[in-house]
Swiss-Prot record:
HAMAP family: RuvC. It catalyses: Endonucleolytic cleavage at a junction such as a reciprocal single-stranded crossover between two homologous DNA duplexes (Holliday junction). It comes from Haemophilus influenzae (strain ATCC 51907 / DSM 11121 / KW20 / Rd). Its main location: cytoplasm. Keywords: Cytoplasm, DNA damage, DNA recombination, DNA repair, DNA-binding, Endonuclease, Hydrolase, Magnesium, Metal-binding, Nuclease. It is found in: Cytoplasm. This is Crossover junction endodeoxyribonuclease RuvC.
Length: 190
């Protein structure tokens, strides 16, 4: 079982979403946004750090997933986003959480099936995947989508690991049978 905290970073609004993964089953635990007032940037970063730390304390996740920085047209906006993202990552690392990063395009591809999906499509699919009665707000939906992407990544990794183990086991069994057959211990019946 994994509890995954997804973060959609922003210098003014940082979305968060928490899900529990048990096998292939995903369960919604909570979501929302850390909103900062029109303050200077250091104070906003302090609020983001405190907010993420509070969420970690409340939900006790064992994994932390965050959206990667994308190229922005405005350099100042990109720098502020990077600082907000770094602040959230520091909160996770200070709470001994492993950090996983996902590109926005991959998140949309995983959740909606289209890497260029818009926020409304992401909200709709998050609502369906987690069987929510109401659509989460956009920033929270994005954060939940990031958590869902990480859950799918875990499931995919387990599938690959199991396939590799099966292949290794099959190869060992084949080698064993060939050895025993060549020594006359088994006779093939056709």
């Amino acid at each position: 079982m994994s509890i995954i905290l997804g973060i959609d970073p922003g210098s003014r609004v940082t979305g968060y979403g928490v899900i529990r993964q048990t096998g292939k089953h995903l369960e919604y635990l909570g979501s929302g946004a850390i909103r900062t007032q029109v303050e200077d940037l250091p104070t906003r970063l302090k609020r983001i750090y405190a907010g993420v730390t509070e969420i970690i304390t409340q939900f006790q996740p064992n994994m932390f997933a965050i959206e990667q920085v994308f190229m922005a047209k405005n350099a100042d906006s990109a720098l502020k986003l990077g600082q907000a993202r770094g602040t959230a990552i520091v909160a996770a690392v200070n709470n001994d959480l492993p950090v996983f990063e996902y590109a926005a395009r991959l998140v949309k591809q995983t959740v909606v099936g289209i890497g260029s999906a818009d926020k409304v499509q992401v909200q709709e699919m998050v609502t369906r995947i987690l069987k929510l009665s109401d659509k989460p707000q956009a920033d929270a939906a994005d954060a939940l989508a990031i958590a869902i992407t990480h859950a799918h990544s875990i499931q995919h990794s387990l599938h690959i690991a199991n396939s590799v183990k099966m292949t290794e086991t099959q190869e060992k069994m084949t080698a064993l049978l060939k050895t025993r057959y060549s020594r006359g211990r088994f006779r093939l019946k056709i």
